[in-house]
Amino acid sequence: MNRTLASIGAVAVVSACSMGSSMTIVDNATLPEPVRVPAGQKMKMAATGVGELTYECREKANAAGAYEWVFVGPVATLYGGDRKTVGKYYAGPTWESSDVSKITGKQVAVAPAGAGSIPLQLVKTDPAMGAGAMSGVTYIQRVNTKGGVAPSTTCDAAAKGSRQQVNYQADYVFYGA
């Protein structure tokens, strides 16, 4: 049984069978309130996502001549505690298990993470497509984020339409009622 401590509260990683991943036990009381799962939710599984977030240089809405990097979408591989691939995460947002069951969802809330890291996040999921590991998942937390913020390179008229990928990593914790 593997045990580690993560940067946000005390998070233990314990071997488990769900999705072939390690289960991350998250003490919601240690997380910022906006990204805590509602009462009655139970952790079903967890995975670490490693991949890239794509940003595109676009003109700011209602600000002619001003530009900014805009998030386009993610592409990540989901790994279990044994470091084996257990699924993938991509635009939608969509989390797809290796058993091809998948879920989409909508962001409920975010909370700041460490400098240079994308925010922590809480997502309310839609019903799963396909039977499998994603069946019954109702919420997903993104915690322990590393990297992934918009590029620091210049975004101006000359760069308009250009895209850049930024490396990131995060733990995804899946819950069901």
List each language-model region with its residue ranges.
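Primary mode marks residue(s) on the alpha4-beta5-alpha5 output face of response regulator receiver
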Residues: T24-E52, A61-A177
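Bacterial N-terminal signal peptides that target proteins for export
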Residues: M1-I8
